[in-house]
Amino acid sequence: VWRIVVLATSGVRNPSAGDLTPIVLAVVLAALVFSAVVVIQPGQTKVVQFFGRYVGTARRTGLSMLLPLTTKRGVSVRVNNFETNVLKVNDAEGNPVEIAAIIVWQVADTAKASFAVESYKDFVKVQSEAALRHVATSHPYDDPDGHGESLRGSTDVVSGELATEVAERVRVAGVEVLEVRISHLAYSPEIAQAMLQRQQ
């Protein structure tokens, strides 16, 4: 095997260091240019860091030239929504209820979304469920007398309170809450029949 390698390379002359300089420079220059080129899709941004320091956020869609030797992390600025898990909580009167909500949100500050929390998507989900628990426990499920706000009778008010609380909790992650709606509300199965009979 070694004999074949020696025979194959015997006709190749040994280039001097001066002959390789233009090739090395061309390769280095090409690497720098390609490290600066980035394609940004609609609804996406690129958070740019230069050796660990935040430089800025590229928002213009299409082909862009950024600083070479930078790291670029994609952050979506599209509108997102998700439905919380169905939570079992006690209302203000101590009755166990099931409640869930739909949260519509969007990243407003890409730097905060990238650096303030580990995962802004997980953060939004956890904080939304925590806010939903808090709001659900501060109101009764129903108000038969009609004197106060209840989860069932004042859904717009409760949704507004929930939107405000979720927005306050996720602001640190650079997230803006666009809309919140209660998607599921019911007494827990173990007391649902008894509460239905009481209402009748």
Feature roles, as predicted:
Residues 183-186:
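Short glycine-enriched loops at secondary-structure junctions
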Residues 190-200:
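Long, charge-rich amphipathic alpha-helical coiled-coil "stalk/tentacle" segments
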Residues 24-34, 151:
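Hydrophobic alpha-helical transmembrane segments of multi-pass membrane proteins
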